[in-house]
Amino acid sequence: MSRTLSKPAGGSLAPWLGVAVIVILFDQLTKIAVAKVFAYGSSHAIAPFFNLVLVYNRGAAFSFLAMAGGWQRWAFTALGVAAAVLICYLLKRHGTQKMFCTALALIMGGAIGNVIDRLLYGHVIDFLDFHVGAWHWPAFNLADSAITIGAALLVFDELRRVRGAR
């Protein structure tokens, strides 16, 4: 009796890692450009609702734990690395599910982009500032955008999957 080894159902990691690498590259290049061109704390109006700024975030989303004394740098770094490892596992296991994997790759690219900042600088560089009048949304970066878009795609993919199961 002969046994044949079948290919894992998930498929290749390469395309999904490629998406993550593209996110990381664009994120890091934009942060480097903004840090070279703008002074810390400066604000440059681009449109009536949008500024480019240079601010540092030692915390997480919305500056959560930004004033925590330093331990958060390592906690958020560990969380980002753990997320990337879990995402690699999920990408390998579900590699044929295009929307699901695109969402995960965007999240992983964003997480690693911010981990790089934390490791290199001890903070995340944020520079996109949207506002209405005097009210400003917290500044963010391309990594944050990729994470948000990836999360929205995960929700959309799950809603689509549940609707298709009916």
UniProtKB/Swiss-Prot annotation:
One GO term describing the cellular component: plasma membrane
Presence of keyword Ubl conjugation: no
Pathway: Protein modification; lipoprotein biosynthesis (signal peptide cleavage)
InterPro entries according to UniProt: Peptidase_A8
Primary localization class, coarse: membrane
Biological process according to GO: proteolysis
EC number: 3.4.23.36
One Pfam short name: Peptidase_A8
MF-aspect GO terms: aspartic-type endopeptidase activity
Compartments where located: Cell inner membrane
Top enzyme class: hydrolase
HAMAP family in alphabetical order: LspA (MF_00161)
Similarity remark: Belongs to the peptidase A8 family.
The protein's name in its UniProt record: Lipoprotein signal peptidase
Species classification: Bacteria, Pseudomonadati, Pseudomonadota, Betaproteobacteria, Burkholderiales
Gene (UniProt): lspA
